[in-house]
Amino acid sequence: MTRRARVVASGAIAVAAAGLLAAGAVHLTGSRSGGLPVVGQVIAAAQRPLAPDISGTTLTGGHLDIPSWRGHTVVLNFWGSWCVPCRKEGPVLARVARETRFLGVRFAGIDIREDPSAGLAFERKYHIPYPSISDPGDLIAVRFGAAAPAATPSTYIIDGRGRIAWAWFGATTYSQLELAVTEVAQP
């Protein structure tokens, strides 16, 4: 294989891998799993790491304090309107939020790397029924330390004791999310 052919092939592989990750067709595990015991499965209660306390200004200008929701299962989604997989995932999250409300499940978004007005337009377009904190500098993700999101979107389920019970890096599906939320909310 010529040098030019190797360069072209390497570039094509990199583009394909990036496309699969962006489309949510793969999720990251191992060392990129954020130091979590498992990604994509509900974590055993004894192995669940504490989630950081998160609060901030919502896209509508209010204040959201996630620790005030202790005792409830919380679904926390990192997203951005610029993120193509987030556009596909938004309606899924909205549907699961509506369908699990009777279980006392709370949903919140973390809108990253953009102006709040773009995030608010996204929420209106996709009828997102829950608040999102504006985080243009990605400061909230950093607070997760070793369990930081490895892709956009990333979704966490935090149990009623404030511990990370489930994580998914990339776009989640309705069946994945609904099953995990139900399992964590009804132990």
Regions found by a protein language model. Name each.
Residues 46, 53-74, 144:
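A short beta-strand-turn-helix
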Residues 121-129, 136-187:
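Thiol/disulfide oxidoreductase modules built on the thioredoxin-like
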